């Protein structure tokens, strides 16, 4: 999970890169933070997709009356 502080830092680096540019160290930090954020989003999306149940599957498993 990406913390609020890390998201804030990502946004600070984006703003700074647009206004004045980043040092090599800041570019590496930005790249690492972005990758961590992307990985967290992918993990969350995968968990949501894995929890989806199809209605047809549920209806087939019901006992017939």
UniProtKB/Swiss-Prot annotation:
It is found in: Cytoplasm. Keywords: Cytoplasm. InterPro entries: DUF896. Its main location: cytoplasm. PANTHER family: UPF0291 PROTEIN CBO2609/CLC_2481, UPF0291 PROTEIN YNZC. Belongs to the UPF0291 family. This is UPF0291 protein BBR47_33060.
């Amino acid at each position: 999970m990406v913390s609020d502080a890390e998201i804030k830092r990502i946004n600070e680096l984006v703003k700074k890169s647009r206004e004045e540019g980043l040092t090599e160290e800041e570019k590496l930090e930005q790249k690492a933070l972005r990758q961590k954020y992307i990985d967290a989003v992918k993990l969350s999306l995968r968990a949501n997709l894995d929890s989806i149940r199809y209605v047809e599957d549920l209806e087939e498993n019901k006992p017939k009356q």
